C-alpha cells in the first residue's frame, strides 16, 4: 500500500466515530431494563375494529403493560402471535396487565385485522417506525418481533427479542408472574 493511501485511510478513521452504530442506524437500540420505558403516542384500532383513539405509555400507569411489536398484519407469524394473545387475553387481567400491539401498518389495516381475527386488544399504528426505533424494533419498513413488559410505574422490566409467535403469550404470562412475586 502506498503512503498516500495509508494517510487517506488514517484521515478517515475519525469520521467512523461520528457515524451511528449499525444498531442505531437500523432498528434503534434496545431500551435498558429498570429504566423508564420510552414514551409513545399512537393511533389505535382494536376492540373489534374501533378506530381513532390515541394511546400513550402513561395511559397504562397503575397497571402492567405488554407492548409487543410485530412486522405485518395478515402474515402467518403475526397472525399466530395475535391469536395467542387473544386466546390468553382473559388471563392478563389476573396479572393486572394490558396487551397492546404495534406495527407500521395503518389504522385501517389494523381495524380490518382486529375484525378478521376477533381481537379485543388495541393495535397501534407506527407508520414511520419512530416508536419502534425507540424500542430497538425497527428494520425499515417493518417493526421486528420484540415484546416489552412495562410495570405500573412505567419502568421497563422485561424484554423479548426475536420471539417464537406460537408460544410467546404463554412466555409473557410466565414472566409477568415471576416479576410480580
Annotated model-derived regions:
Residues 38, 64, 144-146:
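Short loop/turn microsegments at loop-to-beta-strand junctions
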Residues 69-87:
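Conserved redox-active cysteine motifs that mediate thiol-disulfide chemistry
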Residues 82-101:
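Conserved helix-turn-beta segment immediately C-terminal to the redox Cys motif
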Residues 100, 111-146:
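Short, internal strand/loop/helix patches
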Amino acid at each position: 500500500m502506498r503512503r498516500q493511501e495509508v494517510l487517506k485511510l488514517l484521515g478517515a478513521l475519525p469520521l467512523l466515530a461520528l457515524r451511528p452504530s449499525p444498531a442505531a442506524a437500523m432498528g434503534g437500540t434496545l431500551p435498558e431494563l429498570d429504566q423508564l420505558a420510552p414514551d409513545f403516542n399512537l393511533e389505535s384500532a382494536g376492540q373489534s375494529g374501533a378506530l381513532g383513539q390515541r394511546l400513550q405509555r402513561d395511559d397504562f400507569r397503575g397497571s402492567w403493560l405488554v407492548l409487543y411489536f410485530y412486522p405485518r398484519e395478515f402474515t402467518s407469524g403475526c397472525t399466530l402471535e395475535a391469536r395467542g394473545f387473544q386466546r390468553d387475553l382473559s388471563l392478563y387481567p389476573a396479572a393486572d396487565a394490558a396487551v397492546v400491539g404495534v406495527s407500521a401498518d395503518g389504522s385501517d389495516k389494523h381495524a380490518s385485522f382486529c375484525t378478521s381475527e376477533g381481537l379485543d386488544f388495541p393495535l397501534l399504528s407506527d407508520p414511520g417506525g419512530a416508536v419502534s426505533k425507540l424500542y430497538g424494533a425497527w428494520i425499515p419498513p417493518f417493526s421486528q418481533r420484540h415484546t416489552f413488559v412495562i410495570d405500573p410505574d412505567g419502568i421497563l422490566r422485561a424484554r423479548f427479542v426475536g420471539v417464537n409467535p406460537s408460544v410467546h403469550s404463554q412466555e409473557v404470562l410466565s414472566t409477568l408472574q415471576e416479576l410480580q412475586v
